[in-house]
Amino acid sequence: MNWTGLAFVLVSLVALGGCATAVPAMSGGSTTPKNRTDIGLGGAARVPLGDLKDPAVLDPGQSQNRYAADAGGVVPMAYGRYGIARNWDLGLMVAGATVKAEARYEKVLREGTTRSSLVVGLAPYGGWIPDRDRSGSGGRVGFEVPFVYGVDIGGIYELWLGARGSGEYVFGDFQISGSEQRASGAGLRLGPVIGMALGVRRIHALVELTAAYEYWFIDHAGGALNRGGFVLIPGFGLRLRL
């Protein structure tokens, strides 16, 4: 396994990424088998709705933090997972300018040609919010708890259905009324996720959709900018198992 090459790909994706926090789960139908490695490459999008949706026209006098904390967009994505023990794996994902580490455990419900299991994980993440049109920049940290029911049919077809919950903190200096001022905020996100994979032997194509409700508690220059709404996070990619 060429870990140097994988690291180069991940770092390159960070450099190319935009400010959208489009981080998919890409759970698959099970954890990565012991002493095996999964490598995935693809993309993801973040589509905010309602009060989270970006305005069509940027108001120079409005807080630019809202465009950074929960902005929409499309980003490249890559991940790697390694099976450290039976039913346990560790992973690392880069989606745009966000990096997520992950530890997962699998409770097998049924063995055989059709294999089913419950997969739960804990995934801390962090990243930076790059400057967009001189609106300011900052960073983000958070954690996610994914929980899915997965089915693997003959190693050809996989299906997973479950939920993702996360908490996030954003911070930085952003424009408001013509000057950069400190801003910070905390966000909570919860919603269902569904995905499927289809392939042969070691190569599979994956598609996934998360539909979540999130709420932000934001302070910018002493003003409260709380808001909430729904967000869609579709993801897609190719997975190679080594």
What are these regions (language model features)?
Residues 11-14, 79, 198:
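Structural motif
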Residues 68-74, 90-103, 132-141, 153, ...:
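Solvent-exposed loop/turn segments connecting transmembrane beta-strands
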Residues 74-75, 86, 143, 190:
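Residues that act as N-cap/strand-start positions at coil-to-secondary-structure junctions
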Residues 19-83, 89-97:
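Short glycine/proline- and aromatic-enriched beta-strand/turn motifs that initiate or cap beta-hairpins
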Residues 110-112, 226-227:
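Juxtamembrane/interface motifs at transmembrane-helix termini
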Residues 1-19:
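Sec-dependent bacterial lipoprotein signal peptides
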Residues 20, 30, 44-61, 131-242:
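Outer-membrane beta-barrel transmembrane domain signature
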Residues 39-41, 78, 82-109, 115-130, ...:
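Transmembrane beta-strand segments that form the barrel wall of outer-membrane beta-barrel proteins
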